[in-house]
Amino acid sequence: MLFSAMKRPVAPAVPIVNGKPDSLAPYRFVKNHFWDDVLFNDDRLLRTPFFESKLDEYFKYYVSAEPDSLIEEVKYMLLMAKTGKEIYPYLLTKFTNKYMAPEFMGQDKVFVYLFENFYAKGDTVILNPASRKTVTERAYSLMANQLGLPAPALDLVDSLGKAVSLYNLPATYTMVVFYDPNCGHCKEELPRLDSFYRAKWKAVGMTMIGVNIYDAEQAAWKKFVVEKNLKNWIHAYQTKAAKEADEKAGRANYRQLYDIYKTPTVYLLDKDKRIIAKQLTIEQFDDIIQVKSKKPTTQ
């Protein structure tokens, strides 16, 4: 059985359907038969030289990178492996590590799915206390900022002490940039973001919001804004009092809600403040904005 499981399906010749070649048929055949003779609850698979590489090949070439497609595959494999004492925790851990910090934007939805449907229902027992804490905290940091969700509320103040609320700023697009004025990478990236804003994004209705994540760095923040000539942005921060009020009330702070673990952290929102994109390069953000701004609007 294990020897049979090693074999990779051989793609058939391209068939002719209704007088036309069906070029996807060989691909579908290989995908549909990729796991023939494999029992996912068989712990012996872990002691073979082929299983992990075959698993990686399958997800790389035969599963769409779209999160919902990944979830269906992961869900099926874990269901089939559930009774395996070794392979089930192996697969759950492998998928967790892969999608906790995914290669492609939006795939962290798979990790959130795993947390909500496996870990939150008792499967944290397979983790040691440190890993359990890491997985739980990471899940809660990602739940609020999934693509398509309304962005978490941001109630801040600007450099003059005037209130700034994300949901009171009408705009076709909003880019929220969380940064540290003393961060070397921020000093490089924010002027580049501003260049794209001036050259392209302002014309399609973009509002830029720069959020200083360190309330104690007032002088450095104001100096940064002036030196980098970011005069067309809205600049704001959360006061120490507001931060303490969140802590006292047991509310998640915006750093957790926006998963800010590095700077700059950038989000692109639509007119309803739903998350369109996050954690991309400036060029990737620009590609998305150009595509979306050229689409006809629906009434």
Where are these regions (language model features)?
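Structural microenvironment flanking redox-active thiols in thiol-disulfide oxidoreductases
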Residues: 188-228, 243-251
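Active-site-proximal beta-strand/loop segments in catalytic clefts of secreted hydrolases
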Residues: 178-180, 211-214, 238-240
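Oxidative protein folding and maturation machinery
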Residues: 1-159
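Short, small/polar residue-rich loop motifs at catalytic or cofactor-binding pockets
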Residues: 150, 172, 261-263
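Short acidic-hydrophobic, aromatic-tinged amphipathic segments that line or gate anion-handling sites
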Residues: 235-239, 279
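Short active-site neighborhood of thiol/selenol oxidoreductases, capturing the structured segment around
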Residues: 164-193, 207-209
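Thiol/disulfide oxidoreductase modules built on the thioredoxin-like
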Residues: 243-290
